[in-house]
């Protein structure tokens, strides 16, 4: 009953598990003075509690390392996608503009030349008609 109460108080106050383990071992050493048969199991139970504490501590380290790796992966992926999209957009736009400019330049002079030829032909015909 006292151990449960001590556990609740330690949890609410935020004491570290190391301090709590020290309290349980102190209580275990006081118990052998009272009875020797119940003291032996209490001492055996105190040692595994410390071992589990170390395992939990290692687990928390792994989670922080995993978070760091996930953050690195996310940072690497985003800029690569942006760079690819920028390259594609820059390459496509100038090619289309150049093609459109070529088409307009070629069509306009061809029409002007044909119109000029027609005018010259009609002018020549009219000039030769009065002479004949």
Curated annotation (Swiss-Prot):
- Mostly located where? periplasm
Where, per UniProt, does this protein localize? Periplasm
Among Pfam families, the record links this protein to: Asr (PF06392)
Name the residue ranges with Basic residues bias. 51-60, 100-124
The alphabetized UniProt keywords are: Periplasm, Signal
Q: What residues make up the propeptide removed on maturation?
A: 22-69
Q: Where is the composition biased (Low complexity)?
A: 30-50, 61-99
Any one cellular component term from GO for this entry? Answer: periplasmic space
State the residue spans of region: Disordered: 30-132
Source taxon at top rank: Bacteria
From which residue to which does the signal peptide run?
1-21
Q: Recount the PTM note.
A: Proteolytic processing gives rise to the active protein.
Function as written in the Swiss-Prot or TrEMBL entry: Required for growth and/or survival at acidic conditions.
The UniProt entry's sequence similarity note says: Belongs to the Asr family.
The family database entries (NCBIfam families) matched by this protein are listed as: acid_shock_Asr (NF033636)
Please identify the protein, giving its name as recorded: Acid shock protein
Instruction: Please report the organism this UniProt entry assigns to the protein.
Output: Yersinia enterocolitica serotype O:8 / biotype 1B (strain NCTC 13174 / 8081)
């Amino acid at each position: 009953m006292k151990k449960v109460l001590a556990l609740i108080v330690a949890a609410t106050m935020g004491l570290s598990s190391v301090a709590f383990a020290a309290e349980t071992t102190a209580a275990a050493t006081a118990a052998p003075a009272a009875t020797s048969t119940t003291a032996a199991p209490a001492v055996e139970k105190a040692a595994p509690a410390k071992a589990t504490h170390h395992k939990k501590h290692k687990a928390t380290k792994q989670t922080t390392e995993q978070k760091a790796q996930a953050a690195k992966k996310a940072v690497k992926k985003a800029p690569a996608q942006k760079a690819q999209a920028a390259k594609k957009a820059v390459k496509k736009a100038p090619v289309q503009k150049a093609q459109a400019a070529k088409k307009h330049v070629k069509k306009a002079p061809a029409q002007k030349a044909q119109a000029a030829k027609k005018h010259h032909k009609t002018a020549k015909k009219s000039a030769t008609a009065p002479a004949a």
